[in-house]
């Protein structure tokens, strides 16, 4: 039975006592005149008054928030009350409050949401506070907060009950405020440069746009399966075919894959496509975006990330894929281009290989094993193997290389971009190769998308496109090591209900 332990029952009883006193424990009648931050700013000058009593009894203000700390001292009490803008100290005196003080002492508790009216004053310790003249409980919290004023430290509980995490840990609120600022700043950056924000389908008849395993659902009215999108890429490029020369979308993608510190099955990305540009210009635009973000957010160019310090100074390093394998990963030059030699080298180094792989996939295995973990400062890796780049344009100089880059920061891929493949015949052959790979057991290989090939047949202008992971970007900017720390409600393993409200506690 819900709400069954004795402490919750006691709080429920106090709510009933409020009703008996003619007070609604879920009152909706209030007039808040100032947030806590506004109050502290408005009356800051009181702290510099020379008079012994630093107060302004003519200034009546009303505030509201959650009680985070409450201490009774005979005929007086002090409380710390928190709203979204911050914490404000409240002084309560029985002389001024009368019946309200009795109600406070008997029925109000940490966790309750209250409204308080009074005047500003400065305590003997120099803290600007509110001297209460009236107070009432707006919301009676019947579930006690954990550890009272000391915070919530159980990581798993923080993710499962994010509302509790936000109540107890102010720094978590700051992370998600910054995340919101990142998204709005990214949107503004592209709008200022003439990009059009669009919305494309979240349910696809064919999964495509990335090598990943999709989630499958069923459309009852149409009687067909649909796939939650793994990427919006093919729809966005259809729009470029249609004449929109610069488009972007900020939205969710879904991939039915494993979860770890940098992967969540649903995640936020921005993808953007720019006609008559190349991947070289995308790298420059990406650097410009980072400079814009750091300026708007007021961030220093060097940020901590775990035990590392990341230098975001421009320009970012650029290094070709194979050069990175040798110079950063230590793979011998004579091994990189030879399929059997590279396979043997990887096996010798303990890299697990599954099934038949071409030279490009083997190089990708080597990159993941030996290079990625060493990419701390922002680094563009360029000239990817064509085999692992089914939607990217072939290099004019070397048909085995794609005009593609990925940006790595803090050991993680942050973005992926390339000059788009706009040859419909080449795209058709690459889709056929992907289908063959899927039939051979590669679950992440892409499906044939005939309509997309047909769209290319109408002419896609030279175009460059890129996707940037918002979640991983926020991880970097907020020094969080887990993607769960930057997603309000991350995916978690299913477990039996563990709410403390279901447990009977012994006195």
Curated annotation (Swiss-Prot):
Signal peptide location: none
Enzyme Commission number(s) of this protein: 6.1.1.6
Top-tier EC class: ligase
Coiled coil: none
Subunit field text: Homodimer.
NCBIfam families given in the database record: lysS_bact, PRK00484.1
Cofactor dependence: Mg(2+)
Protein name as catalogued: Lysine--tRNA ligase
SS bonds (residue pairs): none
Alphabetized UniProt keyword annotations: Aminoacyl-tRNA synthetase, ATP-binding, Cytoplasm, Ligase, Magnesium, Metal-binding, Nucleotide-binding, Protein biosynthesis
Residues involved in Mg(2+) 1 binding: 406, 413
Domain of life per record: Bacteria
Organism for this UniProt entry: Wolinella succinogenes (strain ATCC 29543 / DSM 1740 / CCUG 13145 / JCM 31913 / LMG 7466 / NCTC 11488 / FDC 602W) (Vibrio succinogenes)
GO cellular component, one term: cytosol
A UniProt-annotated Pfam family: tRNA-synt_2
Catalytic activities: tRNA(Lys) + L-lysine + ATP = L-lysyl-tRNA(Lys) + AMP + diphosphate
Cofactor binding summary note: Binds 3 Mg(2+) ions per subunit.
Location relative to the cell: Cytoplasm
